[in-house]
């Protein structure tokens, strides 16, 4: 497919997509009703031809988004605040970036520099006390990473744990505790209680009197599970207190739903595994900076006499095609498109190639040779935050989605 024309299929959907329930896996009924109305005014197409076009568009769009089937998010799906904040930081919108910096979140420059996809995973609520350890001091977490595509190469992974300030004891502000993260090398059933076989991945000595998220590098374990296809027995988290006055072991580190502080915020404060990967298509998640968010519509200045090749406004609203149930952000974006004449002689501002100049020259004396065409000459990427077909939250960079410049080619 010609680069730059992929996203134009979204617009073409409103002209060609029509089919029965058997072909509705990607485009829901709301979008198809709009298409049917448009086709009714345009004369429509034969049913068989429309079904075939629908299948072709569906397969192409699924491949473009890296999905096996259309996501059908459940009502219980949770979008971690971290992923929303990461999207805002990556999008580079100044007003939102200032708000995020106010809560102390920093953009992960190093992991993101080698990735075009960020995925988040919650453990499967299969929380187990590790045999032989102190009560509530060590836990094992199982993260199901089977939804990561085979062609996606993981470069790094991190485990995020939320910890709350400890205010128990007369000298609580002098205390420290250590958080150790291990990879479980063998399942608990195969080892003697109290002697779980693990390897240390990361450790941190933290002060009691701070409330914040802690990030731990678990890349070695995740790379073993994804690249080397080794069995995934999960991660073990151990909290060791170094202060003489005993506190409620582990209860200030949010690794359990049954904390006395309440479970209403558990969905946002539970442990989060984040992977950074690249599927081999396009560039990494480079951080963009923009002064202001682009408005939904950009009316062009009146150019009654100028019909030459130029960029025109084209806003793609994901709700129009029924994708707003699984695309979290953005709600839509300004894609733009190129349209206009490429008259002889070609002016410098039409951004023409030498071949286009020669072709236009020949066309001026031989009309059987077509004129040069007005096409995109520069395209840029957008970031999308969405729920995949497994209800996992994904932040992905998609190339060639926005027309930045047009020219005669």
From Swiss-Prot:
Pfam families tied to this protein: TGF_beta, TGFb_propeptide
GO MF annotation: an example: chemoattractant activity
Membrane-spanning ranges: none
Disulfide cross-links: 309-374, 338-406, 342-408
Keywords: Chondrogenesis, Cleavage on pair of basic residues, Cytokine, Developmental protein, Differentiation, Disulfide bond, Extracellular matrix, Glycoprotein, Growth factor, Osteogenesis, Phosphoprotein, Secreted, Signal
Compartments it resides in: Secreted, Extracellular space, Extracellular matrix
Region (Disordered): 284-308
Principal subcellular localization: secreted
GO biological process, one term: blood vessel endothelial cell proliferation involved in sprouting angiogenesis
Modified residues annotated as Phosphoserine in this record: 91
SUPFAM superfamilies: Cystine-knot cytokines
GO cellular component, one term: extracellular space
The keyword Transferase is assigned to this record: no
Prodomain residues: 25-293
Glycosylation, residue list: 144, 209, 351, 366
Signal sequence annotation: 1-24
Function statement: Growth factor of the TGF-beta superfamily that plays essential roles in many developmental processes, including neurogenesis, vascular development, angiogenesis and osteogenesis. Acts in concert with PTHLH/PTHRP to stimulate ductal outgrowth during embryonic mammary development and to inhibit hair follicle induction. Initiates the canonical BMP signaling cascade by associating with type I receptor BMPR1A and type II receptor BMPR2. Once all three components are bound together in a complex at the cell surface, BMPR2 phosphorylates and activates BMPR1A.
Subunit structure, as described in the record: Homodimer; disulfide-linked. Interacts with GREM2. Part of a complex consisting of TWSG1 and CHRD. Interacts with the serine proteases, HTRA1 and HTRA3; the interaction with either inhibits BMP4-mediated signaling. The HTRA protease activity is required for this inhibition. Interacts with SOSTDC1. Interacts with FBN1 (via N-terminal domain) and FBN2. Interacts with type I receptor BMPR1A. Interacts with type II receptor BMPR2. Interacts with FSTL1; this interaction inhibits the activation of the BMP4/Smad1/5/8 signaling pathway. Interacts with SCUBE3. Interacts with TGFBR3.
Family affiliation: Belongs to the TGF-beta family.
Protein name as annotated: Bone morphogenetic protein 4
Gene for this chain: BMP4
